[in-house]
Each structure stands twice: as C-alpha cells, then as structure tokens.
C-alpha cells in the first residue's frame, strides 16, 4: 500500500481487489470522498496516471482527475 499526499488531501493506493469500504475501514477518522482505480507509473522524476476515479454521488470526470494527479506531492 502506498500513501501519496496532495496539497490538503491524501490518497491511498491499494492493491488490486480493494473496495471503497476497505478504504473507509482503514481510515475510520478520515472522510473518504472518492474511490477509484488508477494505474500509477512512478519514477524519480515524475508521476503519471491512467484511469479514472469516481467521487461519491457524482460522475467520473477524467479531466478533473488529471488536474488532481498533476499536483501530486511525494509524502
């Protein structure tokens, strides 16, 4: 499991097969507002992601997801 910090939000990248309910159980004191599936390619110089996430009660939005991922900060 990897934890990646983004400005004021935290992202947890789980292994394949994890569900949104698993994320909520792992972090009971935090509000989990989005769960999704992305493929990360991380090297020492850059982070790339492919895929889309689904915010709760909204539609998938690839453009917003890419905006989010471009602002990743290594924790």
Report the location of each language-model feature.
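Intrinsic low-complexity, intrinsically disordered or marginally ordered coil/linker segments
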Residues: 1-75
């Amino acid at each position: 499991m990897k934890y990646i910090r983004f400005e004021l939000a935290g992202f947890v990248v789980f292994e394949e097969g994890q569900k949104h309910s698993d994320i909520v159980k792992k972090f009971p004191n935090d509000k989990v507002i989005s769960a999704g599936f992305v493929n990360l390619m991380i090297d020492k110089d850059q982070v790339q992601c492919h895929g889309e996430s689904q915010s709760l009660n909204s539609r998938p939005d690839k453009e917003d997801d890419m905006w989010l991922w471009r602002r990743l900060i290594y924790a």
